[in-house]
Amino acid sequence: MKNTFARYSLTIPSIPENVISHLRQWNEWMVGDTSDDSPGPSSTVSTMTTTGTVDRRSLLSAASMVRQQSDTTGVRRLVRARAVQEDDEAGPHSSNNLAATMSPNLSRPTRYVKSVSQQRSESYIQLNQYRLMEEIGQGSYGIVKLAYNEEDKNLYALKVLDKMKLLKNFACFRQPPPRRNKENAAPSVLRNPLQLVQKEIAILKKLSHPNVVKLVEVLDDPNDNYLYMVFEFVEKGSILEIPTDKPLDEDTAWSYFRDTLCGLEYLHYQKIVHRDIKPSNLLLSDIGQVKIADFGVSCEFEGIDAFLSGTAGTPAFMAPEALTEGANHFYSGRAQDIWSLGITLYAFVIGTVPFVDNYIIALHKKIKNDPIVFPEAPILSEALQDIILGMLKKDPGHRLMLHEVKVHTWVTRDGTVPMSSEQENCHLVTVTEEEIENCVRVIPRLDTLILVKAMGHRKRFGNPFRNKLSAQSSIRDRRKSSSVKDPTYVPPPNSPPATSNNNLNSTKVDRPEIKCIEMNLSGLTLKVDEAMQSKVESARQ
């Protein structure tokens, strides 16, 4: 792929100098050696600043070649978003406007949209006001695409979920696990998977914390097989992709760890265990703030802790107690998150996880039995090693708890930088049954609305098409009878000859005698049969 991306001419109007410098560094990193005749990074960037048009097709084809590469700065995503802003009639982009574009306003409440319109072009898919662009990641049970909102000019991360898979496999949001004291509890009722989806969306809509990714909008349509969840876009992506030869230094890891600790405390305060804390699920904003993402295997609990059974999440980050099989085996959800947090901190500073194996059974055996070993390089402080070992105790009863991690000497730097209290960091979120029912609404189809309207006109819930059907049948009967009596009627060639009126009595079929009933209707006495009488009586009612 050497020198491939440099052959494309990217042109974006009025890009600030600081962004151009980032683009130049990124382009040099992507192109590498430019000793051949292809244009180098400098010529590419200068073309971008002097031309006022965008070759979108070239841009998209070029960016698709490198979509699998790591983009820690988010510049490539910004370039693609700029390429589709054809309707933006604002003035020249200043640095403040650029910051506003990359930092969406997340203070507004989560919206639920009940109709989705799609438009397809050669370069993108239009979904309501969102332009879907490249795939930027994959969650536990769905893909994530970069989306540009034409209304507020912001970038968002749009997660696409298959509703049929959700209903079939309990895919995205799982049923709460059984409790430890289930022999004394009432028999649990298996909830509809759609109800589990509704409850999880209702919870995510209310979560609001600087260190938790915000759910902005939910797009759903009964005529569409997909559910679209719009999250805030965190510009720099994942903190770290492991394994890596460039781990974080201890000071950077300290800052990121404290943010993650605040977000995890907020989730536990809301009675939610994440179950999949790892570096790739920790996203970094443009101001260096960590946000916890991907709640695909998260679980809500009641009481003081979640007693889980079974495995969920990433195997290398699972606690030893989660790997023990058995129908009556349960383990603490809070302790599982602390273990995953310890593995994450180890990966921050070492660049890999402590237990690695190509075979899952061998990996489980190492997690259960092998001790934590620190390599000779990089050299870690004693306080950092102590907190990692404390969070990675094999016995969950001896493992550090979250409030103990908050006051550890490495986290607080010997008490000079204390963490915020739980009261300052958290506020309780409650979700009522009514909110759960209303978070996912389904609009009826058009034919159902027409049927209900017809019933309203008749002022009763009968069959609004009964008279129409009877009228059509009577019209067919009249046409049939009139055609026989019509003198111009010509029967088919192979039809039997018609009988004369003189022979009608001889061929007449014996029919039962119809009993007539006299009815008084508006002063008139009529003779009708029983069927007609019932129709008249129903019409009177």
Curated annotation (Swiss-Prot):
Residues 440-465 are annotated as: Calmodulin-binding. It is found in: Cytoplasm. Residues 83-106, 462-512 are annotated as: Disordered. Its cofactor is Mg(2+). Residues 93-106 have a biased composition (Polar residues). The active site is at D276 (proton acceptor). Calcium/calmodulin-dependent protein kinase which phosphorylates cmk-1. Component of a calcium-triggered signaling cascade involved in CRE-mediated transcriptional activation, probably through cmk-1-mediated crh-1/CREB phosphorylation. Plays a role in salt-avoidance learning behavior via the phosphorylation of cmk-1. This is Calcium/calmodulin-dependent protein kinase kinase.
